[in-house]
Amino acid sequence: MKLPGKIAIMGGGSWATAIAKIVLAQSESINWYMRRDDRIEEFKRLGHNPAYLTSVRFDIKRINFSSDINKIVKESDTLIFVTPSPYLKSHLKKLKTKIKDKFIVTAIKGIVPDENLIV
């Protein structure tokens, strides 16, 4: 069964990589936001995340990578947030695109530092 609409993975860590692999198995393609361009370029070159789960291979032709969070949000129907909890606020501050009509999924776990918020 293929998942409907365009799905975005928001984060580039090991948890995001694992979720991206699962979602891509059920989708034609995905959008993937990572904050670092150097990691994106290395991922494209190697076919896997250079920093996390390096044995997990991806079909790079089916992934639209970008370090522009607003571009990824605009081009997606569903946003799966998988950023580490300490970076949640900094990522959301960059967000200028409206998310009102988006389907939001959070796979964030942990505590937001300085605020003791559990997510």
Residue ranges and their predicted role:
Residues 37, 72, 111:
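Residue-level detector of flexible, active-site-proximal loop/helix-junction positions
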Residues 1-56, 63-67:
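NAD(P)+-binding Rossmann beta1-loop-alpha1 motif at the extreme N-terminus of oxidoreductases
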Residues 78-81, 85-119:
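Rossmann-like NAD(P)(H) cofactor-binding subdomain of soluble oxidoreductases
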Residues 2-4, 75, 99-100:
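Short helix-loop-beta connector
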Residues 11, 60-61, 83, 111:
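Residues that cap or flank secondary-structure elements
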Residues 60-76:
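A structured beta-alpha segment of the ubiquitous adenosine-cofactor-binding alpha/beta core
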